[in-house]
Amino acid sequence: MINLLLCKLRRVSVFFIMKGVYPMNNLWIFGFEALWSPIFLSMMILVLVAYFLIIGKYRSYIPHAEKVSKKQQFYFVTGIVLLYLVKGGPIDLLGHIIFSAHMTEMAILYTVVPPLLLLGLPNWLLERVIQVRVVRLLLSTVGKPLVALLLFNALFSIYHLPVVFDAVKQSYIGHPIFLAILFVSALLMWWPVLNPLPDHQTLSEIKKIGYMFANGMLLTPACALIIFASTPLFATYTDPQSWMKAMELCVPADTLSSLQLTGPDFLGWIPVLEDQQTGGVIMKIIQEIVYGTVIGYVFFRWARREREKEKNEAPVLPPYLQTKP
């Protein structure tokens, strides 16, 4: 399977180099609002303003609130910027037109953004967030490691069943609700691994590594279904009527009606089946890179702590047995 993924990756690179710029140019016909979502941009700016006010100006009002490191600030800002780009920028619009863009959006939204946001929050702020009743209830129920693991991967897999995918993609209400639930489940899935609070640790370091391996295995069937399918699976990207209905979720109705488009093939992108397989490969590769990075991070942190523990527990020799310099 690794060889197949690498082969597909090479083909993706060639297609992107040859045709990748052309679709982005064509997206301008949908207008600035559809491409950059000013409302969502305003929301993300407000989140960043609130974050910097809390860790800066108002930090002195919070007991035991320490200064937030530049690294943590970088993590949080990067997470918010990526969240905007995949949900408010051109990637979101392109994800309604071609499946590979949709899977790029999914990969970043659920495997990259949540860990960055969690790593960007200081301990003293996290302690107050988890005291919120709703958050506390979620962590005590579906936030348990095994439940969170199964919940996220089940929701992700169910979402990409063709019958569910097409129904959700074309629903004004179902689409944002399902994606919001999936995002919360992603945060809960990452919590047992990246939670820095000593009083809320539920997994040892070695169990965290096993947890991430299990995550990768559980996500594989959904990606494999997409990668190895011999026919296009989703009507949203093949049936003009279904595609047009899905496009209504992100493009103003008057703009869409004035364009007189017949389907997603107006972009001149790669064949639908190739695009679908490419999407599965992109999701799997990004997931493997992120999960592998986190496993490495957890392992080396564990090894460093063990060395420090051994050093601190080493017996101190009496003066007459110590080697003189």
Predicted regions and their residues:
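Short, Lys/Arg-enriched N-terminal segments with co-localized hydrophobic residues
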Residues: N3-P23
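Alpha-helical membrane segments of multi-pass proteins
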Residues: K19-P325
